[in-house]
Amino acid sequence: MLKKIFISAVLLLAVLSIVVSMLKGNNNGEKTVSVPDRVAVINISGTIMSGTDSNDNLFNQTSGVTSGSIMKQIREAAADDSVKALVLRIDSGGGSATAAEEIGRELKRFKEKTKKPVVATMGNTGASAAYWIAVCASDKVYANATTLTGSIGVYI
């Protein structure tokens, strides 16, 4: 009985070794990594502010995004050859017009440099500066039927 268990275990290990060696293949010690095409997603939520982080703005708000952080993500997507498209995921009531203009210019540079599509999607809200960013350089803008959107303008 013990002999049968031992023989079965040896046979099982032999079969497993063959299967593993077949799956592993022969790559001469080189690691092969395949990176599929990707879509870069940039989230723009909360108040849109100028600067590089939330401590740079006048009111020291902690919820929101800054033009510097968004522009950095756009540049990273432009530099990554595996990125085939850019999606802006927007849920913001707006913010600084200056920040929106900075982000818009960076999006236009992205499109000119890469020729890759830009798509904006809006969640609960896409208003004011956020809406301006969405329509600035996007090939398509998508919103839910209940998305609060629009309101590009100024008060005099």
Predicted regions and their residues:
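Small-residue-centered hinge/linker elements
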Residues: L2-K116, G123-I156
